[in-house]
Amino acid sequence: MNPTREECSVAPTLFAPHTIRGVTLKNRIVLSPMLTYRAHEGHISDWHLIHLGKFAIGGAGLVFMESTKVDARGCTTAADTGLWDDSFIEPLTHITRFIKRHGAVPGIQLSHSGRKARTSLPWEGRAPAEAERRPDGISPWELIAPSAIPHANGHPMPREMTAADIKELVDAWGKAAARAHAAGFDVVEIHGAHGYLIHQFLNPNANQRTDEYGGNLENRMRFAAEVAKSVRRSWPEDKPLFFRMSAIDNDGWEIEDSVALAKLLRTMGVDVIDCTTGGMAITPVNASVRPLHYGYQVPHAERIRHKAEIETMAVGLIIHAEQAEAILEQGQADLIALGREMLHNPNWPIDAAEKLGLKPSGAMVPDSYGYWLDKRNLSGIGAVPSTWRGGERTQTAKPSSGT
């Protein structure tokens, strides 16, 4: 019989610590940034603390705050979180302190929706919203984009950005990064994917400018590069900078474009490319062009990792522990991001550890939980939970006091 990993004292790669610049993650598991649409005029609430805190307790190494807007006009909905003003800093410190207290690293994604801004909530149909339904601090809720091209039929026409608009937003990203540092975040991710503003500049169909920000690939990458440079200048040298890109979008942006962009961003101080896809084309044909299957975006992370010589994060229908471990072992990516699977099971890291032959420890399960799980495991009734192998703390079973 072969010895287990536990007996060999060899940790799976998924649970090996990983250092980027001056920040060490306890494992390679990342909560992907996901919009929850629970903010009020950009400000967070207890919802965000409880929502994000449970993933830190559940064992993730890096917990990302959702897409947070650098400019009020860039909100996808009126319920987006914001970081365009100093008033947002102090409430966010409660989240970052809690995440750190439970052994995870807090990260935040900074974004602007461009022509995809000003919509109703997803469960309200995501239809164009009236300009009057704006977050506090802007009047009117103006749509801006690289070119005066609407996101889709029936959506309002955005105003083409001027050179002054571009400079203003490049600066806004840098200022938001400085606020993120003040709020206690240790990782920043620039959102350059899913059809939002930076992606709009990259895509030749959304960007039909004739100045230095449009036309050939070099020009279309200029805005992304300037944003990355601005953020890196405002962000501490010892803290990692991520960039999320749609590796392909089925609407004019291809994998070799992403490789070129990743190479450029690496020179701007970006450390990790978060590899997703899509977000620009909105027609039903999208699904047939890019059929979904487990790990369907992983090959893009692998290609960018090796061709651009930069660390990558894989995301998209990664749900099994063995699947995640294989991605890392085969050199396809450096980090594993989970979104909806973590919503389904915030304790996914604990489950994954056991499935990969590790005994979950106090570093993964809070003592407040582990004590009771140990007790149930050793009670002799056979009710062993799937997420815990007990016995580390309690050597003998004792009668329960009921409290």
Summary of predicted features, one role per range:
Residues 2-403:
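Flavin-dependent oxidoreductase catalytic cores
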